[in-house]
Amino acid sequence: MEKKAKESLRRYKKAARHSATHSSSSDSTSDSDSGSSSYSSTDSEQGVGGVGVGVGVPGGAGGPGGSGSVHGHPHTHGHGHHPRSAERHHRKKKSSRRGGSSSGDEPSSSRRKRDKRDHVQKKLVAKRNHIKRKLKEARLKKRAAAALSGHVHRSLSPTTRAKLKKLAERKRLRAASKEQRERDKLRVVQRDRERDHHRLGSSRSPPSSSTTTTTKIRIHQDIVGKRQKSPGLGSGLGGGSSSSSSRMHHQLMSREKIIIQTRARGRTPSLERERERERERERERERERHDLSLRERDRRDRERERAEREAARDKERAEALARCQERQRERERLAREKLRRQEEEEGGKRGGPGRDLDLPPYGSRERSLDTVERERERERSGRHVRDKRELDPYEREQEYLEERHGHGLIDEMRRYRRRDLSPMPEHYAPRLRDPRELYSEEERERAYKRAYLDARYSSREREAWLEARELRERELQGREYRDLETEDTLYPDERERLIRDRERDRERERDRERERNIGPRGDFRPEWEREWEEEGAGGGPGGPSGTPGRPGGFVGGPKRGKPPAHAGGGPPSQQQHHSASEPDWDADERERERERERDRERERDREDRPDTGGGGAGGDRPSIKNEPAWLEHDQREKPRGWQQQSSNSGGDWRDNDDAPPAPSHPHPASPHHHVHPRGERGSGRGFRRGGHGHGDHGERPGYRSHPPPLMTLPVQPPGGYSRGFPHKRLPYGSGRDGAALGARDGGLPGSSTFLKKHTHAPLVSPTQTPLLNPLLNAAKPNAAAQASAVAAATTAVAAAKAAAQSAANATTNPGILAQVSKLNTVCIKQEDASEDSAGTPELGAQDSPTQSLNLNQSLSSEGNPVKQELIRTSAVEGELSEISDSDDDILNKTDKVRPKNELPTETEQEMDTNADEVKSEALHIVAGHPIKGEEGDEVLDFEEISDGELEEDARHKGIGDALGVDWQGLIAETRQQASDAQAAQQGVDRGTSAKQRWQPYRVLLDLGISFGMAGEGYARCVMEEARQQLLQEKEQGQQRELDGDEEPPAKIPSPLLDYREFLASQQQLEPLACVQMGLRSAAVERQRLVGNVCGPGSRALSARQDLRLRRQLCGLPARECEFPRSVPIVGEGLRNLAMQMFQRRLLDVK
């Protein structure tokens, strides 16, 4: 044995170099170097290594004599060399320790000895590894040979196998428990780390030293020939001791792979490390507390600085406000001095009321107003000493308020001042009850911040609206709220009319100023103001007027907030060069001069016109309520030169009894060219679009050129078409417009309770004027007769207007005409369909004969049946005689202007004679059945209307034609009838609820049922049952209607044939659901075609409709199907073959 061991050692020397490098790599995967699995200690390794020389090889040779000792049977045979080798090993260790301690000073001989011992030790270790490898190879060869020879059972005895199995099981359980402990330890460490992480709140990753890595070691080892650390290793040599029998027997690995998890360097943190970590956490918390305190201190510092800045800013604001107030007081003082010097220069001569209206327009202090009054009294009485009562006028506030209610002059002065320099309307309170509420401190400060704003425009609109509300409240005191009509509110078109009256007076003053060559503030005017007159010459009254509308060529005109551009040498805008709170003294001088001229003009008017029936602008009409004095100073609609009338009319053509003259703008080159000034199309800021009729602008009343036929171009009705005020969109206005006309022209005191409310713009349409003007001419010699005739005519027109919506088609459909004549006592409510102008006739769509027809229907229904035919025939003959047979003449026709001196026709004379009896009835009709408006008694929005909205409205306009036919109304009626008939034909009658429509029997009748899917008998039974249920439901509905349990649904013409009955009848029931549906759709189409031919409201039978009917009745397709000629015609035989195949397929499906 020793020889073989020596041989193996010699073999090892040859491969020493290789084993020195290879053993650490290849054998590390085995159990030799793992240290924790194979061998328990260095002593055992050394001992086994020493013994292995003499023991291991016989097992490798596989001799029969060494079978018992090789495989580790627990025979306690002594081992002779083992104690000596152990002793030698301990000595070696002691000498190596001793040599390690005194390595510096020991002699070289001992160092050589130590080196030699180390070299021998290394050789022994290498030899041990080599022998292990050789043993493994031998085992593998032996196992392979045994497997080939089939004698495996000879290698191990049953008891050996049982013991090995038990040891392997114990080893496996030990490894499993160790792995479980490792896992538990890892889980505990991870939990501690997470707890620390959450407690610190830091996002730092845990230190890498505490991480645990799991190393997987794969060990392929076999049990056969495995050494055990037991005393039985040297049993083959005989003899031995049982001293090491108490050692733990380490069973090496089994055949299968076992994964051992070890901790790579990361151990459980020690106590010192835990303390260090805790100290680190404490330092972190301290730093966080310090940062929080720093942040809090910074925040407090910032808040203190902000408060100091706010206090400094408030102080600066207060100082600036005090400075501004001081400057204002200085200005007021200078203004009073200037007024006093001017009056001294005039020799004490007092001016007209214009002097008070031209006070410095600063409305924040009423004390200045009161002081000026007292200065005038002081100058009149000659005293020049101020007392304390004079210096503090707020003691006289109650007296001032009483005087304001009683004294019209102070009232007008306050209105003028509040209008001129009030802030923007959105900063207003809804009502101004006290003079001190005019300017709050906040608004005064805002005025200094917004010096660039021109405050006149929006404040003027606001003031007009406030005055209108005051007028309404004074008029309607003591009346029931429900008695008020919806038109009682003063809308922007009324304001526009009032403001235009005022503007005409201003324009006259400016013209007189220009005649005297009084050039205010230099002759320079900006280019847009100088050229505006010429550019706007052909554009109607949108040009030089004060509305911010565009003239003809001035496309980029201002929309909002732009000061008015003045004509001629008039003054530029009053507040272009100073802030909203500073007055313009030159403008006030000019205003004073104009007021004096205005007073002289009024005096001349009173002398020239002793009769005040017309109620001129300067006449004695008692309408300071209706047209307050501040309206004379608005700079809005400046009229053209052709609107300046002679002085006997007071400068307003509407006060005359004559029709206005023709406009100065030239006729357009084409009759399709529309002459629509910008102001009429809807200029103005916040005003209703086109709130003034053509007559207001002096346009020739009969002249209205039409657009090309059936085009949807915008045609503005004279009553205006405004989205902002939809309930004002009646055709040509209704009773209120006529009443307003009468109130303006007649000014009757007797009818003032009814007519005073309607201060709307006189919506004079081109169709109205030929009807009403001869009435005025006929009654002109006698003022009383004129007033009664005008009132009667206007109220009659108001009553007749209510029927104008459905009577617009009177000339085309006599049946509708007969129906309309019955509508004398009920005013037609304007439904929501008027949003699409369905019932709103356009300008060209309702000519004067149609209006006279409507009027005469309302007259004749109240007791003039004999005259009705005469009136109707004469009107229709006159209408037809004006139209020639030429299409061009029809399309290019314009309304004829009736000359002023033309005698009234017999129609109007009859109207005149019947005017008195009609008047009260018409008043009763209009008052008893007010026209339904939409919600809202007061409109508080002053939102301007943009061009985009105008174009959008234009797209919604109806279709107007030269023949006066309301095509839009006809189309709407036809659509309604068609939808009703279609709903009835489809069985969806208006009394049917959604729940009823989704009943199973209705669904089955609508969809059909397939015989192939359900079976023929069952399908017929189901359809018949559904049909019976439908009939039963109809009978129940009729019974409920008879009993009066529910309100009867809208009457719809019953279909000629119920398609459900047709579908479910036993003879017509087809086997396929698609065929049933096809039959139903064919029946519905046929019924629709036939039902539209006759019946109420049906159209005349056209050629197209006739052809469709014939195609339907003959079974032809609805449209002509044109096949290309290249398609071959299918032969009869081929067609029959295809049909047979189709029927066979159907039979197969069944």
From Swiss-Prot:
Source domain of life: Eukaryota
GO cellular component term, pick one: RNA N6-methyladenosine methyltransferase complex
Nucleus among keywords: yes
Subcellular location: Nucleus
Comp. bias (Gly residues): 47-69, 537-558
Note: Was named Xiong after the Chinese character for maleness.
Biological role: Associated component of the WMM complex, a complex that mediates N6-methyladenosine (m6A) methylation of mRNAs, a modification that plays a role in the efficiency of mRNA splicing and is required for sex determination. In the WMM complex, acts as a key regulator of m6A methylation by bridging fl(2)d to the RNA-binding component nito. Required for sex determination and dosage compensation via Sxl alternative splicing: m6A methylation acts as a key regulator of Sxl pre-mRNA and promotes female-specific alternative splicing of Sxl, which determines female physiognomy.
Protein's UniProt name: Fl(2)d-associated complex component
Organism, as annotated: Drosophila melanogaster
Gene behind this protein: Flacc
